[in-house]
From Swiss-Prot:
Topology class, membrane: Peripheral membrane protein
Protein name: NADH dehydrogenase [ubiquinone] iron-sulfur protein 5-B
Cellular location(s): Mitochondrion; Mitochondrion inner membrane; Mitochondrion intermembrane space
Assigned protein family: Belongs to the complex I NDUFS5 subunit family.
Lineage: Eukaryota, Viridiplantae, Streptophyta, Embryophyta, Tracheophyta
Cystine connections: C14-C44, C24-C34
Any single GO CC term annotated in Swiss-Prot or TrEMBL for this entry: cytosol
Stored InterPro entries: NADH_UbQ_OxRdtase_FeS-su5
Function as written in the Swiss-Prot or TrEMBL entry: Accessory subunit of the mitochondrial membrane respiratory chain NADH dehydrogenase (Complex I), that is believed not to be involved in catalysis. Complex I functions in the transfer of electrons from NADH to the respiratory chain. The immediate electron acceptor for the enzyme is believed to be ubiquinone.
Length: 83
């Protein structure tokens, strides 16, 4: 990451985040002052927040589909016969 070159020969996608974080760390008194910049850099590298959000959306969609299918099964066509 130190060189700034990505695999395609251009600037790496997270290089700007790294430079901001690195500059903050070299000038700050407390490392916690750079926490937000660190989070931005790590999110750029790993996309963990994005994946968590996508997973929550997927689970909610699946929950709604299950609820709709259960509701459809319960209402059915209204002709429940017991023998």
């Amino acid at each position: 990451m130190a060189s700034g070159w990505g695999i395609t020969g251009n600037k790496g996608r997270c290089y700007d985040f790294w430079m901001d974080f690195s500059e903050c760390m070299s000038h700050c008194r407390e490392p916690k002052d750079c926490t937000l910049l660190r989070e931005d850099y790590l999110e750029c590298l790993h996309h963990s927040k994005e994946f968590q959000r996508r997973n929550r959306i997927y689970k909610e969609e699946q929950r709604k589909l299950r609820a709709a299918s259960r509701k459809g099964e319960e209402t059915g066509d209204g002709t429940h016969t017991h023998h």
